[in-house]
């Protein structure tokens, strides 16, 4: 299977670019326009799905849920102006 490898930083840059350039039809732009309350609900939803996948689903399904949680976490970062280095200093 061929796939594009993204890093935490490259995903952040991609989302930041979408926020700044606002491509038509972008789900990221739509989520940012709805605000942190909407984004926060998605973070919570995906966190729950990670837990359920860890308990009851395959490793592949778990990895997919983790990727969705990372996406929504980074959308929240963009919405709030938090940069990856702000997160890294707390790891």
Curated annotation (Swiss-Prot):
InterPro entries: HisE, PRib-ATP_PPHydrolase-like. GO terms for cellular component: cytoplasm. Its EC number is 3.6.1.31. Pathway: Amino-acid biosynthesis; L-histidine biosynthesis; L-histidine from 5-phospho-alpha-D-ribose 1-diphosphate: step 2/9. Coiled coil: none annotated. Gene3D superfamilies: MazG-like. It is an enzyme of class 3 (hydrolase). It comes from the Bacteria. Keywords: Amino-acid biosynthesis, ATP-binding, Cytoplasm, Histidine biosynthesis, Hydrolase, Nucleotide-binding. It catalyses: 1-(5-phospho-beta-D-ribosyl)-ATP + H2O = 1-(5-phospho-beta-D-ribosyl)-5'-AMP + diphosphate + H(+). Pfam families: PRA-PH. Its main location: cytoplasm. One of its GO terms (molecular function) is phosphoribosyl-ATP diphosphatase activity. CDD domains: NTP-PPase_HisE (cd11547). One of its GO terms (biological process) is L-histidine biosynthetic process. It is found in: Cytoplasm. The keyword Hydrolase applies. Signal peptide: none annotated. Belongs to the PRA-PH family. PANTHER family: HISTIDINE BIOSYNTHESIS BIFUNCTIONAL PROTEIN, HISTIDINE BIOSYNTHESIS BIFUNCTIONAL PROTEIN HIS7. This is Phosphoribosyl-ATP pyrophosphatase. It comes from Corynebacterium efficiens (strain DSM 44549 / YS-314 / AJ 12310 / JCM 11189 / NBRC 100395).
């Amino acid at each position: 299977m061929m796939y594009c490898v993204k890093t935490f930083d490259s995903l952040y840059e991609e989302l930041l670019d979408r926020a700044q350039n606002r491509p038509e039809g972008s789900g990221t732009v739509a989520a940012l326009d709805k605000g942190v309350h909407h984004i926060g609900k998605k973070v919570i939803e995906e966190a729950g799905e990670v837990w359920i996948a860890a308990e009851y689903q395959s490793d592949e399904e778990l990895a997919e849920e983790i990727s969705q949680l990372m996406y929504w976490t980074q959308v929240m970062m963009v919405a709030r102006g938090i940069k990856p280095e702000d997160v890294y200093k707390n790891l």
